[in-house]
Curated annotation (Swiss-Prot):
Transmembrane segments: none annotated. A motif (Effector region) lies at residues 37-45. This is GTP-binding protein YPTM1. Low levels in coleoptiles. It comes from Zea mays. Residues 189-208 are annotated as: Disordered. A lipid is attached at residues 205-206 (S-geranylgeranyl cysteine). GO terms for molecular function: GTP binding; GTPase activity. InterPro entries: P-loop_NTPase (IPR027417), Rab (IPR050227), Small_GTP-bd (IPR005225), Small_GTPase (IPR001806).
Length: 208
């Protein structure tokens, strides 16, 4: 791949607006937090390199706007993504209810092999919780994706979320490569008669 990194993974952050996607990314990429972070217009991305199981992984993380009017812009960015993190706000039930719509978009636009992770952000606001952890866990199990609760403000599980996603993608790629190496080559065995015999047979058929 490169002397600087072993893998390059494209990740997407999706979810409703105001669930904290930009702050979530800012915490991971720059280890900083801003209360008055300006809402993303369209898309933005940051890059960070991490170590995963002895390999250097370069992450290109796209922060997509959650507003409905931007979905036509962001749909093209699903293609080529290795991993997608779906973010909701634990204090906003509607953002959790809309997770299904975001998963439907992934099914529509992303590759079948894309890895997914469900993240309940703003877990530091437990007193305002609207989505029980057990409810989110049950839903994640139902749809077959991992789940974490995070806080960009308090830096809770943010690093873990991206590292878990990176490890899952790396494992998936390694499995695909191993399966490819085990797959027998598609060699077609063809049986035929010597050309001389075919020519002799052909000449007899044409003789009158």
């Amino acid at each position: 791949m490169s002397n600087e990194f072993d893998y390059l993974f494209k990740l997407l952050l999706i979810g409703d607006s105001s669930v904290g996607k930009s702050c979530f990314l800012l915490r991971f990429a720059d280890d900083s937090y801003v209360d008055s972070y300006i809402s993303t217009i369209g898309v933005d991305f940051k890059i960070r390199t991490v170590e995963v199981e002895g390999k250097t992984v370069k992450l290109q993380i796209w922060d997509t706007a959650g507003q409905e009017r931007f979905r036509t812009i962001t749909s093209s960015y699903y293609r080529g993504a290795h991993g997608i993190i779906i973010v909701y706000d634990i204090t906003d039930m509607e953002s959790f209810n809309n997770v299904k719509q975001w998963l439907d978009e992934i099914d529509r636009y992303a590759n079948d092999s894309v890895r997914k992770l469900l993240v309940g952000n703003k877990c530091d606001l437990a007193e305002n919780r609207a989505v029980d952890t057990s409810v989110a866990q049950a839903y994640a199990q139902e749809v077959g994706i991992p789940f974490l609760e995070t806080s960009a403000k308090e830096s809770i599980n943010v690093e873990e979320a991206f590292l878990a996603m990176s490890a899952a993608i790396k494992k998936s790629k390694a499995g695909s490569q191993a399966a490819l190496e085990r797959k027998p080559s598609n060699v077609v065995q063809m049986k035929g008669r010597p050309i001389q015999q075919e020519q002799q047979k052909s000449s007899r058929c044409c003789s009158t």
